[in-house]
């Protein structure tokens, strides 16, 4: 009986069954859609990080910058395969595409500027272990992170990234011609094309909006003479991932900051996985799927820290494709992951992406950061906006954004590690504020608050 069932399972060629085995010919078009939807987003975090470090004492070489893009491809492929085909219950066994996450950029940048790239990956290694532990205990701790709390974190991440995008649109740090009209023109051309494709395009045009926007901006940049191909010419055609490409360092303040980010983003992963199962399978994820998915994310981040890849997350644009097409056959996603992996072996690809002017990157990423911000607002609004919740969210954002804007001078009398944790990024302080206030402040619904006010009037 078992053999018969196995045979029937192997002959199932449906695109709409997770365990089916559709033909390569039928699977490839959907797999390419997923690839186009994530490929640019997967390369941009490494470009942004190396760009932010470019004019500091910890600037990375052009060769290492190319390698970071490659490593991001390796890690995205590894994380996706883990989620598709779990190993020892590490993985969700769900149809998802993983990619390098923008959510960590503010913290990664602040750590890199202060301590260098080795500290970035040292802190990430510890954070990945923390995420794995969170996954093991997700059933017990999830209740402490309602949408209001996780939404405030996501909103703060989006707000903190705007200055990065706008700086890039102006030409980038260290550019003697920063602010030139050419940079702003190319940036807004990229933004306009991206918006038009996203708002008016359909099918593959809509899915590849950012890629098309960058392509048009890139061609315009070549015309204006602000693209340099030296790095592309010098890059090799093939290379293998390197083990420990950077010496890992573990500054305590960097580790604390990164650990907080991993805890919060692990909780956020619950929402990402829920979106996948709701859109493609019309159900909520099981406890085992949530646990396995978060543990896989943690393990992928640990592996990433050892080969130079940044932390990963589920890509919402790929979740959107699942919801739209209802294609959930894991083979389709495995083909996408395989293509991502192949790209990771080709330095020319990374060098080509690195040759994209910062103005073009800024024009493309401003839309991504705006979407992150609005996603946070939607999460917050999914909870009741009672006076209690409004107060908690408002204080979290005010303190988080306010302290960072003031900089070190606001906490000049505090220890250095304390200043690093709370002034490097608004995300950490905002997270702690909303988390603690949500536990401490008595929970009241809008109806209960109205009843209290009515009782006061009656007196």
Where are these regions (language model features)?
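Hydrophobic, membrane-embedded alpha-helices of multi-pass small-molecule transporters
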Residues: 25-41, 179-191, 208-209, 224, ...
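Short juxtamembrane and helix-loop transition motifs at transmembrane-helix boundaries
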Residues: 22-29, 51-64, 80-90, 110-119, ...
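N-terminal signal-anchor module of multipass membrane proteins
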Residues: 1-95, 103-111
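Membrane-embedded helical hairpins/re-entrant loop segments and their flanking transmembrane helices
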Residues: 50-91, 259-330, 456-457
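Juxtamembrane interface elements at the cytosolic ends of transmembrane helices
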Residues: 5-12, 40-46, 50, 190-200, ...
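Intrinsically disordered, low-complexity non-transmembrane regions of multi-pass membrane transporters
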Residues: 1-29, 230-242, 278-285, 293, ...
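Short, non-helical or kinked segments that cap or interrupt transmembrane helices
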Residues: 67-68, 89-103, 143-152, 205-211, ...
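Membrane-embedded alpha-helical modules
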Residues: 111-230, 337, 342-450
